[in-house]
């Protein structure tokens, strides 16, 4: 009887130890952000000046929780003080100056709260350009219960064409 009791106690202790180790490996987050790269490709004839010559253009990318404030924001207010205009809807902001015919990348780890990117191109002729674009981001991925089984989400590539007087999403795909 003592032999069986000792065996049960050892198995029980081993089971509790294993459960404790596995619980220690459990992820506390239920979602993981999807990392992404924004590829900004400028057209050869982008942002023409008064004489029609292509010129560099500044492109600003906002990582957003919601697009409500961005959709209605004035260009000049966004450029002057984006935090005042977008408030807590803005998570991150990155800018690049792109030369005609060139490509720039913005790499981001993403955020579980991010829902979209707001993209603004600072064209010379704002009144005759489509300077604002919203691109939906992939949803944060649900994590596994045990962290050691968890793989990082695949990085997504978001291609944005910065055309003569408009910004357009080309496509979103895994890298």
Residue ranges, per PLM feature:
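A short, solvent-exposed beta-strand micro-motif common in secreted/extracellular proteins
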Residues: 115-125
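Bacterial N-terminal signal peptides that target proteins for export
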Residues: 2-15
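Tryptophan-paired
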Residues: 73-111, 125
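C-terminal motif of bacterial Sec signal peptides marking the signal peptidase cleavage site
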Residues: 21-24
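Glycine-rich, aromatic-bearing surface loops/beta-hairpins
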Residues: 132-175
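Short amphipathic, basic-aromatic surface patches that mediate peripheral association
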Residues: 38-50
């Amino acid at each position: 009887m003592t032999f069986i009791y000792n065996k049960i106690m050892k198995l029980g202790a081993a089971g509790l130890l294993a459960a404790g180790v596995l619980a220690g490996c459990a992820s506390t987050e239920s979602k993981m952000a999807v990392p992404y790269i924004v590829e900004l490709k400028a057209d050869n004839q982008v942002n023409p000046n008064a004489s029609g010559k292509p010129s560099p253009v500044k492109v600003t990318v906002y990582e957003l929780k919601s697009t409500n404030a961005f959709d209605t924001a004035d260009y000049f207010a966004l450029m002057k003080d984006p935090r005042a205009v977008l408030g807590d809807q803005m998570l991150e902001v990155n800018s690049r100056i792109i030369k005609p015919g060139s490509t720039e990348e913005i790499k981001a780890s993403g955020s579980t709260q991010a829902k979209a990117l707001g993209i603004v191109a600072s064209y010379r002729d704002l009144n005759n350009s489509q300077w604002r674009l919203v691109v939906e981001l992939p949803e944060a991925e649900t994590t596994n219960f045990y962290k050691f089984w968890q793989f990082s989400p695949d990085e997504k590539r978001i291609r944005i064409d910065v055309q003569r007087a408009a910004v357009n999403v080309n496509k979103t795909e895994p890298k």
